[in-house]
Regions:
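Short beta-strand and beta-hairpin "edge-sheet" elements
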Residues: 168-213
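Extended, low-complexity, turn-rich repeat/linker tracts enriched in Gly/Pro/Ser/Thr and Asp/Glu
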Residues: 54-55, 147-150
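Short, acidic/charged, Gly/Pro-enriched secondary-structure junctions
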Residues: 99, 151-180
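Short coil-to-beta transition motif at edge beta-strands of beta-rich domains
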Residues: 35-52, 160-166
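Well-ordered beta-strand positions in beta-sheet-rich domains
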Residues: 45, 57-61, 69, 176-182, ...
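Exposed beta-sheet edge/beta-hairpin loop segments within beta-rich domains
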Residues: 126-134, 155-159, 170-172, 189-196
Length: 214
């Protein structure tokens, strides 16, 4: 069904829990993590640090919790080619607080496109191409130039710290997108005749986004 951006809410993670050690991760759909007395609950949002490059710094929703295990909802690690058995251990940390970014304007994104490598053999007059992963994803948002909002304060802090955070985009349909990222705010006001003064912030993805349907 067609959708429009109106009503979309943006937030950033401003507080994380302590690192939780993960001692095993299954090759399954979805992946099941073992972490003794982890204390997580169904629906919690976590950032993963893992020996698997395709999982490292990704963000997932927790599901089917037991005392010592939990699932990474929607994350398929069945392939031992992409996820070598026994090497996905690491840590997770829960997002414990979000700050909404208010007065957002003109959201834009770039990256995420497939990368291709073009090559040719000497004996052939035809070029070939193969896929080689994806370009880095980033978002840019503009905001009303209002330094009294909680979102401005959060972005200022994250810009100064340059630590990893998570951008959450809650669409009007109820679908949610999580992008692990670093944030950099340009708080020099942009003045334009006939427009309100505005600032901007860029969210540089550190791995692929995760999306959950409504």
């Amino acid at each position: 069904m067609a959708a429009v951006p109106t009503g979309t809410l943006f937030s950033v993670a401003t507080t994380f829990g302590s690192n939780i050690t993960v001692t095993a991760v299954t090759n399954a759909n979805p992946a099941v993590c073992t972490a003794t007395a982890h204390g997580l609950s169904n629906g919690d949002i976590i950032e993963v640090t893992s020996g698997w490059g395709r999982a490292n710094k990704r963000v997932f929703r927790v599901a089917n919790v037991t005392a010592n295990t939990f699932e990474l909802e929607g994350f398929d690690t069945s392939s031992t080619s992409f996820f070598p058995a026994g090497t996905g251990t690491g840590t997770v940390r829960e997002v414990t607080a979000w700050t909404q970014l208010s007065k957002v304007m003109n959201p834009s994104t770039k990256g995420g496109e497939p990368k291709t490598v073009v090559y040719k053999f000497v004996e052939s007059d035809v070029e070939y191409s193969i896929n080689d992963g994806f370009t880095a994803t980033s978002y840019t948002l503009e905001f009303d130039d209002d330094d009294t909002t909680a979102g401005y304060t959060a972005m200022r802090t994250l810009t100064d710290a340059q630590t990893n955070t998570v951008m959450k985009m809650l669409m009007r349909s109820g679908a949610i997108l999580y992008l692990p990222c670093t944030l950099a705010m340009n708080d020099v006001p942009r003045l334009q005749d006939g427009q309100i003064n505005r600032i901007s912030a860029s969210f540089a993805g550190v791995n692929r986004h995760t999306r959950y349907s409504a």
